[in-house]
Amino acid sequence: MYEAEDHEFFDVLYQQWSHTTEAKSRYWVVEFDGDEHLQWQVFAVDQTDGSKLWLGSFHREQDADFVAGLHGALPDLIRRLHDATDEAVRKDEANDIAQGQLAEALLENQGLKAQILELERQLDKETS
Protein backbone atom coordinates (compact mmCIF):
# COMPACT_ATOMS: atom_id res chain seq x y z
CA MET A 1 0.00 0.00 0.00
CA TYR A 2 2.21 2.75 1.31
CA GLU A 3 5.51 0.93 0.84
CA ALA A 4 6.47 2.93 -2.24
CA GLU A 5 5.76 6.22 -0.48
CA ASP A 6 7.69 5.04 2.59
CA HIS A 7 10.72 4.06 0.48
CA GLU A 8 10.56 7.38 -1.35
CA PHE A 9 10.36 9.31 1.93
CA PHE A 10 13.35 7.40 3.36
CA ASP A 11 15.31 7.99 0.14
CA VAL A 12 14.64 11.74 0.23
CA LEU A 13 15.64 11.84 3.89
CA TYR A 14 18.87 9.99 3.11
CA GLN A 15 19.63 12.31 0.19
CA GLN A 16 19.17 15.31 2.48
CA TRP A 17 21.46 13.74 5.05
CA SER A 18 24.11 13.01 2.40
CA HIS A 19 24.20 16.72 1.53
CA THR A 20 25.06 17.80 5.07
CA THR A 21 28.64 18.88 5.71
CA GLU A 22 30.86 16.09 4.40
CA ALA A 23 28.41 13.51 5.74
CA LYS A 24 30.19 10.52 4.26
CA SER A 25 33.72 11.36 5.40
CA ARG A 26 33.12 13.02 8.77
CA TYR A 27 31.26 12.32 11.99
CA TRP A 28 29.74 14.96 14.23
CA VAL A 29 30.88 15.57 17.81
CA VAL A 30 29.89 17.96 20.58
CA GLU A 31 32.45 19.93 22.57
CA PHE A 32 32.10 22.42 25.39
CA ASP A 33 33.67 25.86 24.97
CA GLY A 34 33.21 28.00 28.07
CA ASP A 35 34.56 31.09 26.28
CA GLU A 36 31.64 31.19 23.81
CA HIS A 37 28.15 32.64 24.39
CA LEU A 38 26.65 29.44 22.93
CA GLN A 39 28.91 27.03 24.78
CA TRP A 40 28.04 23.73 23.12
CA GLN A 41 29.83 23.46 19.79
CA VAL A 42 29.14 20.86 17.09
CA PHE A 43 32.03 19.90 14.83
CA ALA A 44 32.37 17.59 11.83
CA VAL A 45 35.51 15.53 12.45
CA ASP A 46 37.39 13.98 9.54
CA GLN A 47 37.64 10.20 9.95
CA THR A 48 41.20 9.99 8.61
CA ASP A 49 43.11 13.02 9.88
CA GLY A 50 40.89 14.19 12.77
CA SER A 51 40.60 17.74 11.47
CA LYS A 52 37.52 19.61 12.70
CA LEU A 53 35.04 21.76 10.85
CA TRP A 54 32.73 23.91 13.00
CA LEU A 55 29.04 23.36 12.24
CA GLY A 56 27.07 25.20 14.88
CA SER A 57 26.54 26.17 18.48
CA PHE A 58 23.84 25.49 21.05
CA HIS A 59 22.81 26.84 24.45
CA ARG A 60 22.13 23.38 25.80
CA GLU A 61 24.25 20.25 25.67
CA GLN A 62 21.16 18.07 25.18
CA ASP A 63 20.26 19.92 21.97
CA ALA A 64 23.78 19.62 20.58
CA ASP A 65 23.95 15.92 21.54
CA PHE A 66 20.59 15.26 19.89
CA VAL A 67 21.58 16.90 16.59
CA ALA A 68 24.97 15.18 16.46
CA GLY A 69 23.51 11.83 17.51
CA LEU A 70 20.66 11.97 15.03
CA HIS A 71 23.06 12.89 12.24
CA GLY A 72 25.18 9.84 13.04
CA ALA A 73 22.24 7.46 13.43
CA LEU A 74 20.21 8.52 10.41
CA PRO A 75 21.83 6.25 7.77
CA ASP A 76 21.35 3.16 9.97
CA LEU A 77 17.79 4.16 10.83
CA ILE A 78 16.93 4.57 7.16
CA ARG A 79 18.50 1.22 6.28
CA ARG A 80 16.52 -0.47 9.06
CA LEU A 81 13.31 1.25 7.98
CA HIS A 82 13.85 0.01 4.42
CA ASP A 83 14.48 -3.51 5.75
CA ALA A 84 11.42 -3.38 8.02
CA THR A 85 9.20 -2.14 5.19
CA ASP A 86 10.46 -4.89 2.87
CA GLU A 87 9.96 -7.52 5.58
CA ALA A 88 6.40 -6.29 6.21
CA VAL A 89 5.64 -6.62 2.49
CA ARG A 90 7.07 -10.17 2.43
CA LYS A 91 5.00 -11.14 5.47
CA ASP A 92 1.84 -9.64 3.97
CA GLU A 93 2.41 -11.61 0.77
CA ALA A 94 3.08 -14.82 2.73
CA ASN A 95 -0.08 -14.21 4.76
CA ASP A 96 -2.11 -13.73 1.59
CA ILE A 97 -0.76 -17.01 0.18
CA ALA A 98 -1.48 -18.86 3.45
CA GLN A 99 -5.03 -17.51 3.59
CA GLY A 100 -5.59 -18.59 0.00
CA GLN A 101 -4.32 -22.08 0.78
CA LEU A 102 -6.53 -22.24 3.86
CA ALA A 103 -9.59 -21.22 1.84
CA GLU A 104 -8.80 -23.90 -0.75
CA ALA A 105 -8.39 -26.53 1.98
CA LEU A 106 -11.70 -25.52 3.58
CA LEU A 107 -13.49 -25.78 0.25
CA GLU A 108 -11.91 -29.16 -0.41
CA ASN A 109 -12.92 -30.30 3.08
CA GLN A 110 -16.52 -29.22 2.48
CA GLY A 111 -16.53 -31.07 -0.82
CA LEU A 112 -15.21 -34.23 0.81
CA LYS A 113 -17.82 -33.99 3.57
CA ALA A 114 -20.54 -33.70 0.93
CA GLN A 115 -19.15 -36.78 -0.85
CA ILE A 116 -19.12 -38.73 2.43
CA LEU A 117 -22.73 -37.79 3.12
CA GLU A 118 -23.73 -38.84 -0.38
CA LEU A 119 -21.92 -42.17 -0.05
CA GLU A 120 -23.57 -42.76 3.34
CA ARG A 121 -27.00 -42.07 1.80
CA GLN A 122 -26.29 -44.51 -1.03
CA LEU A 123 -25.12 -47.10 1.47
CA ASP A 124 -28.27 -46.63 3.56
CA LYS A 125 -30.44 -47.12 0.43
CA GLU A 126 -28.59 -50.31 -0.46
CA THR A 127 -28.91 -51.79 3.02
CA SER A 128 -32.59 -51.00 3.47
From Swiss-Prot:
Domain of life assignment: Viruses
Protein name (Swiss-Prot/TrEMBL): Gene 39 protein
